[in-house]
């Protein structure tokens, strides 16, 4: 009986450690690495350095947001960003504000924070992340497209995302 208890205890501890490695934690440079949520960015130093101001001052396009409310149904998003990256610091708060105004279900968003080598304890593997931020949009498990680093064709993040989720041909800035 003791052996079974210790075996179960070791399995529980092992699974907790495995899960812990995926949650975003600060590395030696002070950057988050792992799976992050908005709450991570609302803490210091990120809140006062960039998140709160960008979120507050970003003005979305109301007409595009109205269209996105319908188009985002059934969409899941996998995002990659670096807390060290100026483009990520600009786009992540804007992205959250856009999703808030579009009534997006945040259970369908997974955001991975990467280090300066664009690595996150293996969470980035298989996604070919070359620039951050990168948002990958999926419908029924199929990739529809990616928003990479900055707005491209439409001049705003919401314009580019609307094009992607509307399944209109779209190329991000680094796509040939």
Please state what every model-predicted region is.
Residues 120-132:
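Structural alpha/beta surface segment adjacent to cysteine/selenocysteine redox centers
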Residues 83-91:
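Conserved redox-active cysteine motifs that mediate thiol-disulfide chemistry
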Residues 1-25:
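Bacterial Sec-dependent N-terminal signal peptides
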Residues 20-72:
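N-terminal leader/targeting and pre-domain segments
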Residues 69-77, 94-111:
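Conserved helix-turn-beta segment immediately C-terminal to the redox Cys motif
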Residues 79-82, 106-120:
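Thiol-based oxidoreductase modules, predominantly thioredoxin-like and allied folds used
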Residues 137-173:
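Non-catalytic, surface beta->alpha helical segment in thiol-disulfide oxidoreductase systems
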């Amino acid at each position: 009986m003791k052996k079974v208890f210790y075996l179960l205890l070791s399995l529980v501890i092992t699974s907790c450690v495995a899960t812990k490695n995926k949650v975003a934690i600060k590395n030696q440079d002070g950057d988050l690495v792992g799976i992050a949520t908005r709450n991570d960015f609302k803490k210091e130093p990120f809140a006062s350095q960039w998140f709160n101001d960008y979120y507050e001052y970003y003005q979305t396009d109301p007409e595009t947001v109205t269209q996105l409310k319908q188009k985002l149904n059934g969409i899941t998003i996998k995002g990659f960003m670096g807390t060290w990256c100026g483009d990520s610091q600009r786009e992540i708060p804007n992205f959250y504000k856009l999703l808030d105004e579009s009534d997006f279900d945040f259970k369908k968003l997974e955001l991975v924070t990467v280090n300066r080598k664009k690595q996150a304890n293996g969470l980035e593997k298989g996604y070919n992340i070359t620039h951050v931020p990168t948002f990958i949009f999926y419908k029924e498990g199929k990739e529809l497209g990616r928003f990479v680093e900055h707005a491209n064709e439409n001049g705003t993040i919401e314009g580019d995302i609307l094009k992607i989720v509307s399944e209109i041909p779209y190329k991000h800035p680094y796509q040939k």
